[in-house]
Amino acid sequence: MKKKLIALSLLVGAIQFSCTDDLDLLNTDPTKAAASTFDPNLLLPSIQFEHVNANAGYNGPILFQSMWVQVLASTTSGAANYYSNADKYVISGNTNDYMQRTWNIDYKAASFAYEMEQLTKGKPALANLNSIAIIMQAQCLAAIADTYGDIPYTQALQAKTGTTLPVYDTQESVYKSLLTRIETATNALNPSSPIATNDAFAYKGNVAQWKKYGYSLMLKLAMRLAKADAATAKTFAEKAAAGGVFSSVNDDAYVQTDDSKGFGNANGQALSTLADVYQVRWSKTMIDYLKSTNDPRLGKVAEVPADGLVANQSMTSAGNSTPAAQIGLPNGFDLNGGTTDISKAPGYPGGTGAGADATPIGKYSRPTMIYRNRSAPLFVLTYAETELLLAEAVVRGFNVGGTAAQHYKNGVIAGMQSLAKFGSGATIDAAVATAYADANPLVTANALKQINEQYWATTGLLMNFSEAWNNWKRSGFPVLTPVNYVGNFSNGAIPRRQPYPTGEATLNTANYQTAVGKLTGGDNWVSRTWWDK
């Protein structure tokens, strides 16, 4: 039976949320339940689904970050074409809506987590759930801070007590508070106490895995600060490693969606629409990277459609996945017949089909059908990411144990293993993954470049576009050539943040203006936030 989410008036300030979707059909409606009788376990899947929903489909990253960091590419352009936000940095008809969805939905998730924290506070039988509530708040609020910069934090989620116009806290203070809260909450998780009973992660309440997740999240947030505050990064990265981070792909944090029950994979839903099937392709940057080392993932993730427009628009016909046949679409081109027409791109391979069935982009690689699976997982944090971050931590001189080379090898293999969660069609044999990692070891002279390019590829291929973008901002890798399409909103630079929701300027004006005053260049797409050095 489909269930409804809990309606809570806990949202930050006076946020106006966009329309709900299928993921809002999860929990039994307990709006008449008293706090003394309501089971806060019911809130956990709402938090988890809202968070992954904030980072999937048309709620933002596929329409922005996926092409900003050149994982995907698209020939769509113009005000009516939503991928112009991403591929060409050009405003579309709904950009103002799209750019506020991560804010709105992740604050919604954080509000559920805050309520779960309050309902479990001081109750020994719910102590583990209390810790999980704090960890999930950190996951959601960090995602908002990564995307926008300074955000409401100390006064956020307080509408029930009358605070509807919250002040903005600096990204620095938010991060340092989150790291401390994660540490305290993760340390408090106790395998001897009752487990969470309504967990949408694959953990199903397993306290040992939640503990690893908390420390792995701490590691990720610590490494965000590697350039902005190396001392804090080192302290918390070392604490995370000592506490115990992910140790295998079985620890991956993800939500397994189920379209038949009304909460499908929003990326799969997007990539199953006719326009997306046809005009969303893998970027040349990504395909060239995978081909440069004969990465075995290439034959699992990319295909060239059969010849002709009809085949290119087919959602059910598999294409040619032979690695040698794959060609990535360069970002920044269109089908408009002018100087930026795809036919003018360097090395243009020509189209396929003839007459009414002709298509100029028919030889470019698109995502395979594993990505059109509406019941595929939505990843939050993986073992592969954790190992690659540990590799970088070693390179930076942090005392996290192990060698950079071994952590890197583990991360490379894990990235291939995690891909199998999309289905049997994405499985890479363990021997193949190991042989690839052995043939492509970490080279000391290029260590940071190698590690972070692998991180970009792994998160991108797992459709975690916001994480690929955030780590690119932090590390500078891969080195990308920006698009400078006519009429773009970033002066030909790759966007480094999303502007605040328009409602903040009109409803929370004074606090919004204070926050904007701290941004060099103002509330635009290229102002750098505190940790983005």
Language-model segments: what does each one mean?
Residues V395, I413-K533:
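C-terminal functional modules
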Residues A233-L390, V395-R396, G401, A405-Q454, ...:
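Hydrophobic-face positions in mid-chain alpha helices that act as interaction patches
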Residues M1-T28:
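Bacterial Sec-dependent N-terminal signal peptides
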Residues S77-P152, Q158-T197, N373-L378:
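Conserved, well-structured interaction surfaces
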Residues S173-Q256:
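Internal, well-ordered domain-core segments that constitute the primary functional module
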Residues C19-Q70, S74-T75, N104, E115, ...:
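Membrane-proximal, proline-rich intrinsically disordered regions
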